[in-house]
């Protein structure tokens, strides 16, 4: 992550706002994305696809771009997916359904995602870049969580661009506190950390925040991210169920053991009675 990467995301946000207009529609501010439009970008999915393609071309289009920008910043893919997921989340339909539809129609079914990246051996196409990071056909994305991740990413990018302008950024301290608080809340949520895609996104955010913190440690004191103890109700419930299951199994085992021990005792007692009767019969026969 660096300021130049963030400037591309800021540019897209200016040309293609990350909120719907008053009519509930996605809007382009101008014709900046016309080279990425299919069918004139006459529906919402096509507009989002144009923005997504712009990002991949900006960072991964050929070997020179890949070497210059993306090779040491492969986490960019996570940020593109955060942007894509957030933009799709503005639709009324379920986010998971929108992601699967977008992947099948535009990524898997679109030649610009499947074309070979010139001069790159590590990844054959944009589609492979995505699939090595995220399985968009089998991921459970939540709109509110994606919104929080997107907010955290925007704060991080704001810090990168502001530090690039001024290494003694006075407002960055408050932004850093805001970012760390949001990150720790997300990282403390079991429903998030138990999701592979969310985990990768969180990992990229923390890695790039720590890089920024280390880079400007002499000029600014940014708060550290604390490791979070997950105490969600779901994890507690799971642990409680496990404990109850163990005690239940022990109880059943002890019950069976008691039953068999009692059965064995009764059996031995009957044998003893039979032996006593036989002794008495022998005594009478010998008299």
Protein language model regions, located:
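C-terminal single-pass transmembrane alpha-helix
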Residues: 223-287
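N-terminal targeting/regulatory segments, especially signal peptides of secretory
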Residues: 1-231, 235
């Amino acid at each position: 992550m660096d300021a130049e990467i963030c400037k591309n995301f800021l540019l897209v946000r200016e040309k293609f706002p990350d909120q719907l207009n008053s009519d509930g529609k996605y809007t382009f501010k101008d014709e900046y994305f016309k080279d990425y439009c299919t069918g004139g970008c006459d529906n919402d999915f096509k507009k989002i696809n144009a923005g997504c393609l712009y990002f991949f071309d900006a960072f991964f289009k050929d070997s020179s771009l890949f070497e210059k920008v993306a090779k040491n910043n492969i986490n960019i893919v996570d940020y593109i997916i955060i942007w894509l997921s957030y933009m799709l989340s503005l639709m009324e339909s379920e986010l998971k359904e929108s992601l699967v539809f977008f992947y099948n129609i535009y990524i898997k079914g679109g030649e610009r995602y499947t074309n070979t990246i010139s001069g790159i051996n590590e990844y054959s196409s944009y589609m492979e870049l995505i699939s090595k990071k995220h399985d968009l056909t089998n991921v459970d994305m939540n709109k509110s969580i994606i919104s929080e991740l997107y907010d955290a990413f925007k704060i991080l990018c704001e810090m990168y661009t502001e530090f690039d302008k001024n290494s003694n950024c006075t407002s960055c301290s408050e932004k850093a506190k805001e970012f760390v608080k949001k990150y720790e809340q997300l990282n403390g949520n079991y429903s998030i950390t138990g999701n592979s895609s969310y985990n990768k996104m969180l990992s990229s955010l923390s890695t790039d925040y720590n890089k920024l913190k280390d880079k400007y440690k002499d000029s600014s004191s940014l708060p550290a991210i604390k490791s979070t103890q997950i105490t969600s109700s779901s994890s507690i419930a799971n642990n409680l169920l496990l404990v109850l299951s163990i005690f239940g199994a022990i109880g059943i085992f002890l019950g069976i053991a008691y039953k068999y021990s009692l059965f064995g005792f009764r059996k031995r007692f009957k044998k003893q009675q039979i032996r006593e009767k036989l002794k008495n019969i022998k005594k009478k026969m010998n008299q």
